Structures are given as structure tokens and as C-alpha cells.
Amino acid sequence: FLMGVHQGHATVRNNQFDKALHDNHTVATVLREAGYKTALIGKYGLQGKGQDAESWEAYPTKRGFDEFFGYVAHRDGHVHYPSHPWPIGNSESHRTGKQVWWNEREVSSELTRCYTTDLFTARSKQWIIDHRGTAPEQPFFLYLAFDTPHAALQVPTCAYPEGQGLNGGVRWLGRSGKMINTATGTIDSYRHPDYI
């Protein structure tokens, strides 16, 4: 999808996790050249070798995205609470904390009790609100790549807040330790009343 070619012609083969996405056109570069504002929020896993946004050869902002917020490494997207280790994980990479990047800054230490589905939803909603406030006439492309359900099969901390749309439900607060309005309670604990 990102390269705009049939999967039989794609350069990422055989689940080669974290292989660098070739320096070629992506849907984001094409749309950005056409005047769109672009963002990728969620799980990426196509960065190549390196340790940070500057050294990763194919970091999302180097492949056509104006903004990136999410997991860069494939393995990090297996756990849904980035600042909390998953103690029953079946590998060391599952049991340790994960890295979430916001453009060129690693922010996982600010994400206490943030469940990634809520986090990526809230960040996406806020990105749309911000874009509408700064450039309402400019078209946009938002690629939202959730990491759930996957490996850890963790659940949220609480029931979803009332309301809907950009100003209701899950919302971005943007404060360290309280990035989203559902970052409360005990991690991996919410059970819907119908299933108790």
C-alpha cells in the first residue's frame, strides 16, 4: 500500500521486519507533492538499521510524512502499554518497555497508562483538529496503523468516555503522564459489564 504497487511487486518480502523502505515514491510523497498535509500515526516497522530518527534511513518523515507518532520498530508494536513492561511476555523484547516516537523525539516515558489504541486514536483526532485550525483548505492524508489486537492481547484501563466525534470520547490532553483522557486506572484491567 505505501509504495502503490501490488504486493507481488513490493520490495518488503517474507516478513522482513524493520527492513528499510526503499527511497522511492510512497503514497505519502505523492500526496505531499500534490499539496496534502501527511501524517502516519501508529505502527511503522520499515525504518531500517539505526537507533533514532536521525540514523534510521527510512524514518517516516524521510518517506513523505510531515508528522509521525507511534512505534518505529516492529517488535514494539506487540505490547499495548508502551511505558509498562509486559511481565508475562515470551521474550525479553516483550518484557521491556517500548519506544514511541513523536517526530524526532522518543516520548514513551510520558505515556503512563496509555493504551495504544486509545493513544493513536486520540493523537489522530488531535492532528485533524490542529490541521483544521491551521490550514482548513489544505487536503490531508492520515495513515492510522493500529497495533491491536496483537501478541499481548491487552485491554484498556477503563470504559470509553461518553461522546463522539472530535470533541467527545477518547481525547488527546498532551500532558506528560496524562497524554490522553483514558490514561487512568489499572493497566490491562477493563472488562465490559456484559462479560463479567
What are these regions (language model features)?
Residues 1-196:
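Formylglycine-dependent sulfatase
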